[in-house]
Amino acid sequence: GRELPLDRVTDMKRMLDVAITSVRRISTDLRPLILDDLGFAEAVEWHVAEVAKRSHLKIVLNLPAHELVNDDARATALFRIVQESLTNILRHAQAHNVHVSLSSNGESLCLRIQDDGIGMPEKIRVGGIGLVSMRERVNALGGEFRISTAFDSEIHPGVLIEVMLPLKAHNEEVVL
C-alpha cells in the first residue's frame, strides 16, 4: 500500500478529533449525561450551584415536585429550560436574584423561573432562539409555555417564565 505523508495523517487525525468532539457535544445536547448520573433534582441543584459559583446571582431553588419528573423526556426538557433560562439571565437580565421552583397542582407540573432584572423586550420574547427552543420542548410534551415581564416594579420588572407540563404523558392514554 501507499503511505500517506505525515502532514496528511496529522490533518486527518485533527478532523477525526473534531468529528468525535462534535458527536459527543450533540449527544450531550440531546440528553445531558448529568441527568443519568445524578437524576433530575440533583442535576438541577448542581447546575444552579455552578452558575451561582461563577456569577453574582443569588439563586433560590425549590423543587418539592421533583419526584414527579419520572421520565427522560420531561427531565431533559425541564433541565434544558432551567439551563437556558439561567444562561439568558446571566447574559441579558442584569439580575441579582433568581427563584427557580417546581411544583404540582395534581394535574400539571409547574416550573417557574423568576428574576429581578431589567425585563425583556417584546421582540426577544417572541423570537429569541433559546426561547423558541424552550417553547418547542414544552409543546412536544403537550404543555404550556408562558413568559411575562413587568410583574415586580417599574424600575426592575424582571422576567417570569412558566412551564406547565401535564403529569400524564402527552401521548399516554388513560386505560380504565
What are these regions (language model features)?
Residues 1-176:
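Coiled-coil dimerization/phosphotransfer module
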